[in-house]
Amino acid sequence: MDETSPRSIDIESLIPNLMIIIFGLVGLTGNAIVLWLLGFCLHRNAFLVYILNLALADFLFLLCHFINSAMFLLKVPIPNGIFVYCFYTIKMVLYITGLSMLSAISTERCLSVLCPIWYHCRRPEHTSTVMCAVIWIFSVLICILKEYFCDFFGTKLGNYYVCQASNFFMGAYLMFLFVVLCLSTLALLARLFCGAEKMKFTRLFVTIMLTILVFLLCGLPWGFFWFLLIWIKGGFSVLDYRLYLASIVLTVVNSCANPIIYFFVGSFRHRLKHQTLKMVLQSALQDTPETHENMVEMSRIKAEQ
């Protein structure tokens, strides 16, 4: 039974890795287009800065999984243990960064709806840029410290309690991001359906809600397994390993879904043959309610272009 288990696991790993390659190619292409348009073709506001950084995190996250699956399918030998630790740490950083960006986007949107006067008049101008820089730096630091104390040098230095403290801090931070994401999303939904003055739908609001929904369905399971791995040192059973592979495929789907969401929301009720990708993305991130007059005006502007 011990001789046949690794072979069966390899066969079971083949299909997920093929799916990661396929979804990875789609996601890399889509996120590269979003990065190009947001980086060089569109004027960036507060939300677009977060979405640009989210697309960058998704692109690099997909690239890591694509390389990992390609090495598995091509049977490329892993150089050494340090490479594994570094590669795993990079994926951790990118996952936490993506979750942090989503929480920041939802919180930013919540503030713009619940405190519109403060948001538009007193909010510091470069808050989004500063927050994105802080998120990247903080994600890198906590992941490097966790790997340093627990996996790479932990047994040599005997830092068991320091490792446990870093694990606790990592888990607490993940829980904090998840709670912030859920509370800000619930506040937006409550304001939309239960407020005295009901908030009107905008394409940006729909884009944010769909992005969060896809993350909760596809991105969260991998984070859940990862959270358990921090505290459970024993090996997975075959069933757990299958679920873990499924969670990896789902998180790849999550990272490649955002450009598809932008395309879907931006092209809804518009004629695709008269739209460029720039127009579609700009429409998906539009933060004004669409009245009939607005749609006529947009159609006139696009016709002139």
From Swiss-Prot:
The keyword Membrane applies. It is found in: Cell membrane. GO terms for cellular component: plasma membrane. GO terms for molecular function: G protein-coupled receptor activity. It is a multi-pass membrane protein. The chain crosses the membrane at residues 18-38, 47-67, 82-102, 130-150, 168-188, 212-232, 245-265. Residues 39-46, 103-129, 189-211, 266-305 are cytoplasmic. Coiled coil: none annotated. Expressed in a subset of sensory neurons that includes nociceptors. Expressed in the subclass of non-peptidergic sensory neurons that are IB4(+) and VR1(-). It comes from the Eukaryota. Orphan receptor. May be a receptor for RFamide-family neuropeptides such as NPFF and NPAF, which are analgesic in vivo. May regulate nociceptor function and/or development, including the sensation or modulation of pain. Belongs to the G-protein coupled receptor 1 family. Mas subfamily. This is Mas-related G-protein coupled receptor member A7.
